[in-house]
Amino acid sequence: MNEKLEKMRNGKGFIAALDQSGGSTPKALKLYGVNENEYSNDKEMFDLIHKMRTRIIKSPAFNESKILGAILFEQTMDSKIDGKYTADFLWEEKKVLPFLKIDKGLNDLDADGVQTMKPNPTLADLLKRANERHIFGTKMRSVIKKASPAGIARVVEQQFEVAAQVVAAGLIPIIEPEVDINNVDKVQCEEILRDEIRKHLNALPETSNVMLKLTLPTVENLYEEFTKHPRVVRVVALSGGYSREKANDILSKNKGVIASFSRALTEGLSAQQTDEEFNKTLAASIDGIYEASVK
């Protein structure tokens, strides 16, 4: 664990988010050039997305020189690449740290303009399996659409409550309270969020290490203090609907923050490409995101 923690804390590179779940899979496949008439049920759909993820992970461009970690969906964790479970393949063949998406999706938007995470009664069992599958860390997402101090406080409190369970299971949690980039009051949301996160970080015991995954902030370096916080392993950014070019541009202006992009990583990849075209496109995408992460 120490070698892995050291890599995550100080390594150069970014985190590839490959954790599209049931809701976002059809969209991800469509962007990849696989239409909905090409599969007739969930199993076929997940087989196709696993093929896409396998193609990305096995690509020569996908390696530890630029990529520190990869976030997986539960079904991907239980699937294999060349006879090895995905997490083992990532670490043993690529020296890339495997993370697992552990949330069960979002509750509906509430009166405070936030979406907390759905209840997760089987979390303890999932964390046990994650350990058996050699997962390094976890990720869970909530969404903030309004500058409501009460709503944002609840989002952050829930995130840190679940993070404590993850830490107790011996894993590193990525706390992801996403601020919707279309918020009219995005700046206020982000300031309230920063203050809430600071409060919770300062209350963590010394044995707790967490990561933060945050929307690229409107105010440059808003989260810089967290990159130096003793309880924070790394601060990563989500692309949140910005184009890759725009996301990379904003990211490069935020010191100490690295990318954890999903859609921005796979932009331009297609099932119809030859391996040579696919690898070339992926390499260019990885290079751009890497440069913005290490700036």
From Swiss-Prot:
GO MF annotation list: fructose-bisphosphate aldolase activity
Pathway listed: Carbohydrate degradation; glycolysis; D-glyceraldehyde 3-phosphate and glycerone phosphate from D-glucose: step 4/4
Name of a matching Pfam family: Glycolytic
Catalyzed reaction equations: beta-D-fructose 1,6-bisphosphate = D-glyceraldehyde 3-phosphate + dihydroxyacetone phosphate
Protein name per Swiss-Prot or TrEMBL: Fructose-bisphosphate aldolase class 1
Keywords: Glycolysis, Lyase, Schiff base
SUPFAM superfamilies in the cross-refs: Aldolase (SSF51569)
EC number: 4.1.2.13
Organism: Fusobacterium nucleatum subsp. nucleatum (strain ATCC 25586 / DSM 15643 / BCRC 10681 / CIP 101130 / JCM 8532 / KCTC 2640 / LMG 13131 / VPI 4355)
Single Gene Ontology BP annotation: glycolytic process
Family: Belongs to the class I fructose-bisphosphate aldolase family.
Disulphide bridges: none
